[in-house]
Amino acid sequence: MNPTNLNFGKILKQVEMVDVNEDSLDLKFPKRTIVDISTDTFIKIIFEKDDNYYLFLNYVNALDLYLNYYTNINLVSSNKQLLNQDEHIDVYFKGGNVMNYHFRTMVSDPRLKELFSAYFKKSDFDFSVSIHTDTDNRFNQLKTYVYPKIIDYLITTSNLFNEYLQEIINGDINKSTIKIDPKFLHNFKQDNADLKYYTIRDTIKDIIGLPRFNFVKEIIDNTRNTNTKNFMHIRQIDNIGRYIRVKFHDNSIIQFIPSDKSFYELKYTPYIINNFNQVIDYYNEYVLNGLIPVYHNFYENSKYHACLLYPYYKYLVEPIGQHEMEYSDLIDKIIKYNFSLLEKSEFYTKEKINSMLQQISTSLNELKDTYYEKNSDNPPDKTEVTNSNAFIRYTVNKNRSDNPHIELAPTNNFLVYNDFEKSDPLSIINFDDNQTIKTTNNVHYVSGNMLIKNILGNRQILDFDLFRIKFNLVAVNYIFENEKLLREFKIPSEFIDVSVTIIDSNVYNEDHQTFIMPIKLDNTIIPDIPVKSHSYTYFIGDLIRILFTDFNFFPWMKGKYEKRIKRLLLLLYLYDQQHQTNYLDTLYNMATNIKYNLTNPNKTQKNMDKYALSKVHLNSYKDYSNLFDLVYIDNKYGPIKEPMKMLLIVSEILDKNNALDIINHFRKYLKLAPLTNISNLKTEFGKFLDEIISTYNDINPQNIQAKSSINTLVSRNNYSMIKNNRRNY
């Protein structure tokens, strides 16, 4: 079955309530520790050169143009409403790579770069597709157009890289599979044309989103004349049997059989007629005298903008698809040209592949622990989370006589989802038959996961779909599973991740604080498609959410917490430098004062009252379901309010005889297993305070300064001339 034939808007999910026990062996020693070695090694070797890094980003980022054009043009072809008003589709480059960029561009002090570089390394290439709209029904409708194109793009990509990899393995190092002349880019994007594009695009989106616009459009379509410069106002509309009769102010009349039955149901009062005439005025000014000349100008001088406007032009002006083949050809050339740049840059070489396989082996040999995975058919109960026999156990084979080694391994493309009409709802679609796999050497394979919907505690809904390309590797005779040596153990490297956040997820409407990340390539012509990403201030909020408010309020009980707290504190330092605030100093001063109070209980205690607008309401804790509601912090502390609350609340809880009851009260609302004792809480909290203090001292903010931010911020403003009563085209 072809996955692009699925009705993605109809796929349902089984909601899972996540009950977490932080002591569970699969969290402390997860199986993915073994698997992630391949990704870390792939990134280290393949993206060692910045050119490869930026060329790969340039290649994947074309997905933004691809999705926006094909989603809208397919909506037009299906007689569905185009993206309108505040609807938008954006592809964001996200994750550790973007933090790495901010670190490298904003931190100039060599000492800091050396101290913190390990926490801001290059990572796998993560992208998110934001499908922004207002209702579930519309979101599901847009999914049916967006998802097939995501899959198409990833399949095209995997095919290109598989063919290229096979050439490298076969020794065809001088063979270039793709040759595209960059001359096609000479009028790809006009300098300083973005504002003109945003203005006309947002205006047109507002017009087609107006109530009853479809009525006026059908009247215009039935009145259309190639010589018409402006459409006449309507005087009267009547139902005449099967026909709608429209009389204009110049007494001309048209009759037509409407495509929409609601034409017959509407009462054509003077108010409605005036409403229609207002829309006609908008059409005359912003379509006939706005969109048309702007589109034709872009068609000659800025193909990128013309391509994005073309679906609106086709819908409103010229339904015959004059330029569709041209834009499809343009997008195809962009993909192939961008890929050819990677070939020329020697993205893969035999030496790189061999080095990667060897380094993965070396890293596996260094693993000494046992790693765990839950058995989905027989998961451990609450009493077994520390019992190794209740889990699937993995260890590394140290016996060289078994010839443990790493191999490239072709495998199937697949998609997993739920089909609740079946007795076993879990459905897996394989895109390819076995013969295709053997023929194409499908080492880069595409996967899709539409099962993920978790509820974390009583507040956080985690709902997203995930599409990936992975670079498939297997560890041969390398891994024991429950003491049995496996012939093959899959350790695929991440290659490209594309996630789509679903409309009911808690983070669906988060402020992305978009900025345009520059691609730094000297003497290389590339299509100028903006790389939409996140500002460093976005990551401050994201790290605070992960560390303090996501499902567990104790940061030190979460994975990778040391790395994340160091990232957060350094980003706060950068924020303070840019905005003349003192958030980092505030957290440092709180940590040192609380640490003093903890270690000197018999001495006069440091007063912490100045940091809060209220006392910590521990005596009435049962009245609250959220730990962070126990104390109020002044809004002047902006992004650090949650860390401040946690510091104040935990320092107070430690003095209470009923501390365990208080903590478990709030864990209950987060669906977390109750703690049986907190004898180590004071020690763990003290170590957390030490982490803040030592990181602050490493930064030593009094003696260094950050570079000025060079990020190009992009506002999510609506540039519509209807909303703003202006003309900019």
UniProtKB/Swiss-Prot annotation:
Primary location class: virion
InterPro entries the record matches: DUF5851
Gene Ontology, cellular component aspect: virion component
Organism superkingdom: Viruses
Subcellular location: Virion
Keywords: Virion
The family this protein is said to belong to: Belongs to the mimivirus L515/L516 family.
Protein name from the UniProt record: Uncharacterized protein L515
